[in-house]
Design a protein with these regions (language model features):
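N-terminal, positively charged, Ser/Thr/Ala/Gly-biased leader segments
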Residues: 1-3
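Mg2+-dependent prenyl diphosphate-binding active-site environment of isoprenoid biosynthetic enzymes
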Residues: 6, 13-26, 30-180
Length: 180
């Protein structure tokens, strides 16, 4: 079997497992507050390549990390990614109306509910990591995710992106933004 086929099978298996995990760990459909839960599920379960969870599983399997920690780390990464997409699609940012071939969360649920869904997904990402069976490992992961998503990470990069709207950034600006 070629390495490409082996990787493809591995990625497909992990992605299927991740879909089941996300479906299981998100609040259940119809659970109160129904619109918020619906918007959260819509944002996370709407498809996508699941690159972040796959990278998490790959790195974790290489380092022989426990499966439960890998699941929680992969879920936290995807929750952060989904929250960032929900916020990025909003009219105040990129004003996108389609994501993954369907209406964005704010188009489907309204701006206020989409904002709350993004906020709730961010909070859930940290709650998932805080629930890791080894509290010290969980806290290290919480800190790593907070730094990666915060002012000197993803949010900082988005701020730089917004500051350059209408401008043609140079290589230095692009490198700085991409490093965050």
């Amino acid at each position: 079997m070629s390495e490409a086929i082996e990787f493809s099978a591995w990625a497909h298996e992990r992605a299927r497992h991740f879909e089941w995990l996300a479906e299981t760990m998100l609040p259940k459909p119809g659970q109160e507050p129904k619109r918020l839960v619906g918007a959260m599920r819509y944002a996370v379960l709407g498809g996508g390549k699941r690159i972040r969870p796959l990278l998490c599983y790959a790195a974790g399997e290489i380092s022989r990390a426990p499966a439960e920690r890998l699941d929680r780390a992969a879920l936290a990464l995807e929750f952060i990614h989904s929250y960032s997409l929900v916020h990025d699609d909003m009219p105040a940012m990129d004003n996108d109306t389609l994501r993954r071939g369907r209406p964005t969360t704010h188009v489907r649920y309204g701006e206020a509910e989409a904002m709350l869904a993004g906020d709730a997904l961010q909070a859930e990402a940290f709650a998932v990591l805080a629930g890791i069976d080894d509290p010290a490992a969980g806290m290290r992961l919480v800190g790593t995710l907070a730094r990666g998503a915060g002012v000197f990470g993803m949010c900082g990069g988005q701020s730089l992106d917004l500051a350059m709207v209408g401008e043609k950034p140079g290589e230095a600006e692009l490198a700085r933004m991409q490093s965050m």
